[in-house]
Swiss-Prot record:
Active site: 155, 192
KW Ribonucleoprotein (keyword) present: no
Assigned EC number: 3.4.21.88
Protein family (similarity comment): Belongs to the peptidase S24 family.
Region ranges (Disordered): 73-107
Residue ranges of DNA binding: 26-46
Protein name per Swiss-Prot or TrEMBL: LexA repressor
HAMAP family from the UniProt entry: LexA
Pfam families: LexA_DNA_bind, Peptidase_S24
Record text on subunit structure and interactions: Homodimer.
Amino acid sequence: MLTRKQHELLMFIHERIKETGVSPSFDEMKEALDLASKSGIHRLITALEERGFIRRLAHRARALEVVKLPQQATAAAPPKGRGAFRPQVFEGGGAPPPAASPAAAANDSRELPILGRIAAGTPIDAIQHERERLPVPEAMLGAGEHYVLEVQGDSMIEAGILDGDYVIIKKGDTATSGEIVVALVGEEATLKRLRKKGGSIALEAANPKYETRIFGPDQVEVQGKLVGLIRRYH
């Protein structure tokens, strides 16, 4: 049985992964649970890990995966179209996990265009051209138009986004404060967490090596928001 704080943290991680495709940072978890320090988050994560509810992903800074939810939580709010929770991050040789049959596989994935590279670091030239297409599990997608970008740089590593990852982006020009977005600044595109601060827009990295950049609201154009990622092993 989980304590109230353990349950709150587990559900926060679960919901954040569903919304953005990546686990929240320790700072975000601390803020969400209204704790005074990260040490409390460390203790809660260790307790959840020992009880088999979450696991840490190897070779990914502070990245977590929800393995299971408490019985009452899964019964009350099962993911749409699925009998059990499935993480939004798929890792493997470049293809989605195998389905039960070839027919099922054809129905459960969608070919999305890879439009180029996106900077997780210093902004690079805006993405313009389709390079190839990538099969993406339908479980990662919802309604709307989506596309894929290859990550270049290390500024989002504490959000579990590594150099060479393929991020799945839902096309759109709006985002909620705290979401990870593709932001166009002038003629350059970057992948960052967007924060709305008064009349300004902050683009935050998830790596202490990089500074938060502040812009006026008319200087940042949202091109879409992160819904998941795929990792290829070569």
